[in-house]
């Protein structure tokens, strides 16, 4: 539809889905809009972005649709955070405030990242099964074994951080799927014995590291929501040193600076998370765009 078309252009920048792959446009558009709001939650700033996008609708239709939806997401999370043009004490937050509940914001960001990675893993499994790669679907790091390992890692982290325990049960949960992945890697390699051992070791280590690093990458979702408040606080701090006129000029210019500069940075960071933490797991982007046959008569 016309709403998804602008997001399709952003997906195409990474690549075109082939015949067997899930078209990620719907997932991309929903998660991109959601993440932008989480990272740039402010009622006033969101209204400015949405209004500005509407004013540009005639000249930049695709851009205006994306901008308007991002603005609405920012407004929505602005109510969640209780933030209005950087002021955190005008309205009550509906749920959490990055200023007063930074730990909760960090945990929510990690939870969102885990959900995002699980969905990406499920799509990778679906793509493997579609083309008949059952071994990869069940036993690879991006298959069911990889998903079970990730779930086991989440469980182990929860047990360690919340219940302060990490015992035999957690070790078994981690090693069981990992053993299937290592066995699959061993069978896939055609190198000599020593090289095969080295390949399996390196690939397993890479899987473990990427499991942790990919999840922690989503901490930037929380980091930018905290950064948003810090920038606003800096603006208000400078404004407080001036007379009435200087105060409001500084506040207005500071908010414009935040909307333009931080808004652009957040949009790019969201794109990075989509491409490198999402698409790289299930989307090859090696398809070819459909071009209808044209006959010259």
Where are these regions (language model features)?
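Conserved, carboxylate-rich catalytic/transport cores that coordinate ions
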Residues: 1-297
């Amino acid at each position: 539809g016309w709403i998804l078309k602008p997001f399709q252009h952003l997906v195409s920048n990474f690549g075109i889905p082939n015949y067997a792959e899930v078209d990620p446009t719907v997932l991309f558009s929903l998660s991109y809009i959601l993440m932008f709001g989480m990272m740039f939650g402010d009622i006033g700033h969101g209204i400015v972005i949405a209004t500005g996008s509407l004013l540009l609708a005639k000249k930049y239709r695709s851009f205006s649709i994306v901008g308007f939806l991002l603005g609405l997401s920012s407004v929505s999370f602005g109510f969640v955070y209780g933030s209005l043009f950087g002021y955190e004490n005008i309205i009550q937050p509906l749920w959490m405030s990055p200023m007063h509940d930074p730990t909760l914001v960090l945990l929510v960001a990690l939870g969102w990242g885990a959900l995002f990675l699980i969905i990406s893993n499920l799509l990778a499994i679906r793509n493997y099964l579609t083309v008949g790669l059952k071994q990869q679907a069940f036993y690879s790091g991006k298959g069911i074994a990889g998903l079970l390992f990730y779930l086991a890692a989440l469980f182990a982290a929860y047990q360690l951080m919340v219940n302060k325990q990490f015992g035999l049960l957690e070790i078994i949960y981690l090693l069981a799927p990992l053993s299937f992945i290592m066995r699959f890697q061993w069978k896939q390699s055609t190198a000599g014995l020593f090289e095969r051992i080295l390949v399996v070791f390196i690939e397993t280590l890479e899987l473990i590291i990427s499991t942790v690093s990919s999840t922690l990458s989503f901490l930037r979702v929380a980091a930018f929501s905290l950064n948003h408040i810090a920038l606003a606080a800096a603006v208000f701090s400078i404004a407080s040193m001036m007379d009435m006129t200087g105060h409001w000029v500084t506040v207005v210019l500071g908010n414009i600076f935040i909307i333009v500069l931080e808004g652009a940075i957040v949009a790019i960071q969201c794109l990075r998370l989509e491409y490198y933490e999402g698409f790289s797991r299930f989307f090859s982007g090696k398809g070819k765009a459909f071009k209808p046959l044209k006959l010259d008569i």
